[in-house]
Regions:
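Gly/Ala-rich beta-loop-alpha elbow adjacent to hydrolase catalytic centers
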Residues: 97-106
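Short beta-alpha junction loops
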Residues: 61-63, 100, 124-130
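Conserved alpha/beta-hydrolase
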Residues: 48-65
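The conserved beta1-alpha1 loop
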Residues: 29-34, 99
Length: 270
């Protein structure tokens, strides 16, 4: 497995930023992730609709899928912004779309880009992971492995050690499940699943630990798309956030075509 860090400890850019499409129009960065669903990723759906616009995928789980257990949101955002700066001209507007729990990461990236160019953060159904969310997610993953009776993870202290501790619990539960099912020879499959679980929990912990102050001074314009009546963003006044209400859809697909069209309209109509 490739190590996500360089010799000086920086996040490897080839694991945090990937260009999906090329183009001459205003660039779009999409912070999203492929956690436990086989559904198409938002970044790929955007790339097929944002005609003529270069689309980049910012993937926090890739940045956390190697030997390094934990990376802060600020460090991930800095590396993504730096790599993007090497790929695109340093002027002209840029859009950063953040999906769900990746909202804070998108705001970090947009704030960094806004230092040298107009930048807009478009947050689709933003969520702000906290201790309760991580505890619930950890319990769900443990239950998926048919284990029970696990205590809630300790999330304070050194974050790398917190992630490693959760990983050790999940690894033991996976080994027990494999043995009970006669699957001792499926180490590779379980190792991949463990890495997915670990990177997801590490990302949520990075979101929970982030002070959410980097964007408080403004710089990037912020739009929130959600079905909810409230479009609040931590550390920003309501007047600094543009709220676009999403329609209530019967479609259980969270990234239904109607939703994607509304997101794309935000990056093509300005």
């Amino acid at each position: 497995m490739a190590h996500p860090g360089t010799d000086d400890g920086a996040v490897r850019s080839d694991l945090i930023l990937r260009q999906l499409t090329a183009g001459d129009a205003r660039p779009v960065l999409v912070a999203d992730f492929q956690a436990f669903s086989s559904a198409p990723r938002l970044s790929h759906l955007i790339s097929t609709r944002a005609q003529g616009q270069p689309v980049y995928q910012v993937d926090p789980l890739d940045a956390l899928s190697g030997d390094r257990a934990y990376v802060s949101l600020a460090d991930m955002a800095a590396e993504a912004a730096e790599e993007f700066g090497r790929s695109e001209p340093a002027d002209g507007p840029a859009f950063v779309i953040g999906y769900c729990s990746a909202a804070a990461l998108a705001l970090h990236v947009a704030t960094l880009l806004a230092r040298s160019r107009p930048a807009v953060a478009v947050l689709l159904r933003p969520s702000w992971p906290d201790t309760e969310m991580i505890t619930t997610q950890f319990a769900t993953l443990v239950a998926n492995l048919r284990a029970s009776g696990r205590s809630s993870p300790v999330l304070d202290g050194d974050p790398g050690e917190c992630v490693t501790s959760m990983e050790q619990v999940l690894s033991a539960d996976m080994a027990a499940l494999a043995a009970s099912q006669g699957l001792e020879g499926a180490e590779d499959a379980f190792a991949e699943l463990l890495m997915t679980y670990r990177s997801w929990l590490a990302f949520l912990l990075a979101c929970r630990n982030d002070p959410r102050s980097a964007w408080s001074g403004g710089g990037a314009a912020v739009t929130v798309l959600t079905e909810l009546p409230d479009a609040s963003v931590p550390r920003l006044s309501p007047s600094a956030v543009k709220h676009e209400r999403l329609p209530e859809l019967d479609d259980k697909n969270p990234v239904a075509p109607e939703v994607i069209d509304l997101v794309v309209a935000q990056v093509t109509s300005r």
